Amino acid sequence: MSLFKARDWWSASLGEKEEFDQGCLCVADVDNSGTAHDKIIVGSFSGYLRIFSPHPLKPGDGMQAEDLLLEVQLRDPVLQVEVGKFVSGTEILHLAVLHPRKLCVYSVSGTLGNVEHGNQYQMKLMYEHNLQRTACSMTHGPFGGVKGRDLICIQSMDGMLMFFEQESYAFGRYLPGFLLPGPLSYSPKTDSFVTVSSSRQVESYKYQVLAVATDADSRKENEQQKMGAGKKVVADWILNIGEQALDISIVSFNQTSFSIFVLGERNFFCLKESGQIRFMKKLDYSPSCFHPYSSVNDGTINTLVGNHNNMLLVYQDVTLKWAAQLSQTPVAVKVANFRDLKGVIVTLSESGQLQCSYLGTDPSLFQVPKVESRDINYEDLDVEMKELQRIIKEATKTQDILPKMEKDDDLTLVATVLPDLDSVSQAVDGEVESEVIPSVSVKLCVRSRLTLQKAVLLISTPAPLALTQDQFIFDSLEPGVSKTASASVFLKGNYPPADLEGSAVVSYSKPTELNPEGVPRIVQCKFRLPLKLVCFPVQPSKVANHKLTIDTNKPPVNLINLFPEFIDQVEEDQVSVVGFQLLAGQKVTLLASKTSQRYRIQSEQFEDLWLITREFILRFQDYFLKQGIKDFTCSFSGPVPLQEYFELIDQHFELRLNGEKYEALLSERAVQFRAIQRLLLTRFKDKTPTPLQNLDTLLDGTYRQVIGIADAAEELQRNLFRAFTRLKSATQLVILLIGLWQKLNKEQIAILEGTFLPLLKDGQELGWEESVDAALSHLLRTCLSKSSKEQALNLTSHLSIPKDTSRLKKHITLLCERMSKGGRLSLSADSGSQQAAEMQGTPINPSVS
């Protein structure tokens, strides 16, 4: 904010709810009074044209009636007003008014009044041009070096320059590569037009080049080509400024050289006539308008710059000389000479605040209003404080973040998985190498207590399981009426899933008194898919690389009671072995001991053990629960197969490292491809044809490399997703074994799941290894710490891909060791010191809780 404000000399408020822009302000001796006193011409988008001649009785006065010389309402919006020698046969000034579809030239004259009401002014239409295209802006000047008259150039919204030689239309030309209109100005010294294109380049076009180019109005291109007439419009010079421009002004004062000023969105440029930068100024604000004017110092130019902070800044070249506060944000600024004062700054705001001001040292003061004082009643304050404390106490009784659900939900969702597989498989686009890919149907029933509109049902299953349809939309739900939806689930990818649990969610909006459109609500349910969806019975295998032994506290159970769908009815009463063949995995064998209470699960792939082991324990629990036995437990005597687990971690991590290499290689080839493109573009733009020197061959080869690397990167991402799914299966198996080994409760198993499975999806920026390592470090530093020194260690707050997996493996091993020595998982703050004291004693037997 400036220390000083612009001193108000004269001001006026124009109309009501009218809008103004950059071209709506002009200052000139439009009535040719001969006194060299300027008048202010203002046009508005509402079609009003006003001419003012300020004569304040004292500085700061508002507009008097006699200050308004003329006010006319035109039929069309006024886009721009200019004053020049626009009428042939005379060199007096006339007023040009640009409308969207019309150009009008008027003569403004005044008649001396004989009475006290003052002089009379009138505006006479000299000629007009109806435009075939919608106009955007115009500029004028002695095009082609003519003497004693000004020609007009209008820029249309579609990029055409229309030239008018006073009363007659001359020709029209299209600017090359046009997209959106930009500021346009004429340079008398070089006889050229300067604009800023949509490519963020300052471009200069010679008038002679435009005059002899192909006629834009003539569509008989074939005839012109036969006659040999017309040339291509080519820019004289181009300068890339890298931003859009707000305005262009071309000045040439006596003591300074010719200069082209360009006001950008963040920079202010001064160019030479050849397009070279004379100087530039980086602005730390958003400018709204500018106006260069003559400086008292030789060789310099002063510039007024208005910004959106209601500031007016004065620069001498690049040096800030003065800053003043304005009452409004200016959209146009000019410098005018009036009868009583010269060098007046005229500003116009978007809402029509016209202000004439000068720079001075009138401070911009802000006085804080006095606060109304009142006597304080401490007894009333105590009563109010107690009431507020009571309200806060009641509000903090519950720690729930989400609001409590009602006893009877507005909407219920029930999912039912059919017991039998589909007679005709619904699998489509499967990648599994199997003759038959089974599918199972899931039926979902939605029932509402209220009338609801636009309820959306979404179904999701873990990859690589897929659905025939995963989204259903119910346009309306009536109270008490059930609606059902059905979809089939099948295995699509050529690898086993990490889970067989799916979920369904219904989202809807419930109208309330405060929000009639409805408050978003959701209802969700989960369903478990059958094991036979991903495997089928086979002959058991006696040997395998990976084996697990599960102990129970109950006598052996006939496996036909646990897996009836996988075992055919046989004459033997006791079945002690079952074989499972995963559709996208290895064979898994389940063996039951006939003499002990042990069961063995074995397979050639470690991660393939997970689904069968999990299903085996769940069916065991259901079997004994149906018989009313509640003290059934399973246990694992160890050791936890960490080496097999570490191999899967290394495979997943190696794919992540390869992904980074592919990204770096793809980035390098892309840079090379763009560099070759630039070289080729330079050769093609050169007016003198030169050999390509095999650049086209190099471009084609680089393009093929980019496509090949991109395809390889996509294939790597698919392999990485498969590896993450296998790692997730192995991780869940390790968590299950640790829970059985240490007899962990549900809360402790939930901590392990949150530690080892923090991500639903793996990625390059945030991957599984660094996330799990950070969580393990926290557990080892808190509840599983051996001493207070470990608790004092600070963890890094930045997660990045590690160099290798040695640190992660070490932390996983430490976790198992410390849990075997009595460490217990807990999220409480004081658990770390207690566990440290326990683990400093005698080691505890791993099989004892």
From Swiss-Prot:
The record marks 141 as: Critical for protein stability. Keywords: Cell membrane, Cell projection, Cilium, Cytoplasm, Cytoskeleton, Membrane. Residues 825-849 are annotated as: Disordered. GO terms for biological process: cilium assembly. It is found in: Cell projection, Cilium membrane; Cytoplasm, Cytoskeleton, Microtubule organizing center, Centrosome, Centriolar satellite. Residues 828-849 have a biased composition (Polar residues). Pfam families: PHTB1_N, PTHB1_CtH, PTHB1_GAE, PTHB1_hp, PTHB1_pf. Residues 1-407 are annotated as: Seven-bladed beta-propeller. GO terms for cellular component: BBSome; centriolar satellite; ciliary membrane; cilium; cytoplasm; membrane. The keyword Membrane applies. Its main location: membrane. Signal peptide: none annotated. Required for ciliogenesis. This is Protein PTHB1. The gene is bbs9.
